[in-house]
């Protein structure tokens, strides 16, 4: 008998215990437009039926010279339409790209502009928004992060301590938001 072929995209192992079930997807260089090319991603997201979806994109788009704010708005809108089409009801938290540098010396102004546009988009679509530019207190924070040994020498990517700090700050923001909600 000939065996059929199949594709295994992922596997979820869980039990009946309370707690967080965490899923992650992403590849270095991924952009909003990469996800919208693959409807199956949204089908699988709907099957998981998450309570919270955290979207952290925008850095890669900000390094494309021909990619502007209008392109970002279009790509975010297409992404959102795919979510709506599948009636995905989980809360969405959009995070902005962090401050970064181009060629190790110039502020990535597009990342700053994208951060603003993402905040506007999140507000218009009732998504929560976490602005890494505001958390950093300035668009030129990357050299400080580098001097603090939190980012790599390219002044775009973080190293483990930097990612850990970002995670800690995000977790604190989530808990603070939840505490405010409970009050």
Label the predicted regions.
Residues 1-74, 157:
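Conserved SGNH/GDSL esterase-like catalytic core that processes O-acyl groups on lipids
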Residues 79-83, 122:
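Hydrophobic positions in alpha-helices of CheY-like receiver
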Residues 70-78, 110-114:
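Charged helix-capping and loop-helix junction motifs
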Residues 54-61, 82-115:
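Active-site segments of SGNH/GDSL-like serine hydrolases
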Residues 40, 75-79, 169:
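Well-ordered alpha-helical segments embedded in enzymatic catalytic cores
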Residues 99-183:
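Catalytic His-Asp segment of secreted/periplasmic serine-dependent ester chemistry enzymes
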Residues 43-44, 82, 173:
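A generic secondary-structure signal
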Residues 18-21, 48-53, 87-92, 124-128:
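Loop/turn elements at helix/coil->beta-strand transitions in domains of secreted/extracellular proteins
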């Amino acid at each position: 008998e000939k065996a059929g072929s199949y594709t295994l995209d992922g596997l979820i192992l869980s039990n009946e215990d309370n707690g967080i079930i965490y899923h992650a997807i992403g590849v270095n260089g991924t952009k909003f437009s990469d996800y919208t090319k693959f409807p199956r991603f949204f089908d699988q997201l709907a099957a998981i039926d998450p309570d919270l979806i955290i979207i952290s994109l925008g850095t890669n788009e900000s390094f494309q010279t021909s990619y502007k704010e209008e392109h970002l708005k279009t790509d975010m809108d297409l992404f959102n339409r795919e979510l709506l089409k599948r009636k995905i009801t989980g809360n969405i938290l959009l995070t902005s790209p962090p401050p970064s540098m181009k060629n190790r010396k110039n502020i990535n102004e597009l990342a700053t502009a994208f951060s603003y546009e993402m905040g506007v988009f999140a507000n218009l679509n009732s998504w929560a928004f976490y602005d890494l530019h505001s958390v950093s207190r300035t668009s030129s924070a990357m050299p400080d992060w580098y001097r603090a040994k939190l980012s790599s020498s390219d002044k775009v990517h973080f190293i483990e301590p930097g990612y850990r700090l970002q995670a800690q700050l995000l977790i604190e923001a989530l808990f603070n938001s939840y505490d405010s909600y409970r009050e």
